[in-house]
Amino acid sequence: MDIDIDDILAELDRDTTAVASSSGQHGFLDANSSMQHVTQTTAFDSSLPHANNLQKDYSPVTPEQDYLQLLKHWRNERCAPELLPLPKLLVSRMLKRIQDQMEHIENISMGFLEHEILEKDGEEAIGQNEYQNNALNNGKLPLLCMEAELERVKFVMRSYLRCRLNKIDKYSLYLRQLGDQGINLISLDELMSEQELKYHAKHSVILLKLLNNSILRHMPPELQAINDTEGSVSMIEEPNWKKFVFIYVNGPANVADDPQLQQSEDGKYYYNITIPEFDEIVELTTGSIYVMRYDIVKDLLRDGKVELI
């Protein structure tokens, strides 16, 4: 599924307010909710080789689990100084569920007056009005709850994508340098979606044209290099790797699967990290919170062993 940033932001801004609802009290994150037409999915695409064998070892991914994962990626993206890899499958599933829930709410609102408010032959006008008002009041509350819950999910998704776009704008030349030199641990294709790559390419071209037309072409040739890093101040703005961040140590679901995880004498599990400047080893105990420099824990963050808070 292609991830179109423009379509995402436009779709999430669309007004989904409806006037009424049926009597079912279901939410967006409930696996047995009114989204019965949205089946549970797994983290693997069945069209990939050996995907059927992989699916046997993994349980289905519920909407609630996906939402919690989205919250974790959202917090990490907002707290990290660099652009983190995009969880493409997770974002695709969440966008599909958001769209399906929006359509479901609209279907409920359009069919409510037809199916729930029935005119009774022979009733007096006052009694009929009371019946209709009670039906409206009883059916509107569940729909309002569904809409409020959907708006929370849309807010998180919208904030997550805009935070990523802001980092692409801020570190456009740095990301361009990583792509040209290939010095990054992961490729730009894994770091960004297809639409984010197109946005980054167009933004960097516009920025380079602006710098060249306004400043660089009026300077001596030896000073026109936009990627000059030989002076005291680099021409390319990089993320602040020395930034201090709060981390929560998750640890793996199965301690036997992580060779880096060690066990202390009192039975607690921890990770060893080294602070190069002091040649000091620090133990990060699972389930604990620490304040560390980002460059020290970024590898643990990418492996999912810690999360930013």
From Swiss-Prot:
Family recorded in the similarity comment: Belongs to the GINS4/SLD5 family.
Top-level lineage group: Eukaryota
Descriptive protein name: DNA replication complex GINS protein SLD5
Annotated keywords: Chromosome partition, DNA replication, Nucleus
Compartments in which it is found: Nucleus
Subunit-structure text: Component of the GINS complex which is a heterotetramer of SLD5, PSF1, PSF2 and PSF3.
Transmembrane segments: none
Classification via InterPro entries: GINS_A, GINS_bundle-like_dom_sf, GINS_Sld5, SLD5_C, Sld5_GINS_A
One GO CC annotation: GINS complex
Coiled coil: none
Database matches in Gene3D superfamilies: 1.20.58.1030, 3.40.5.60
Listed GO biological process terms: chromosome segregation; DNA-templated DNA replication; double-strand break repair via break-induced replication
Function: The GINS complex plays an essential role in the initiation of DNA replication. Has a role in chromosome segregation.
Phylogenetic classification of the source organism: Eukaryota, Fungi, Dikarya, Ascomycota, Saccharomycotina
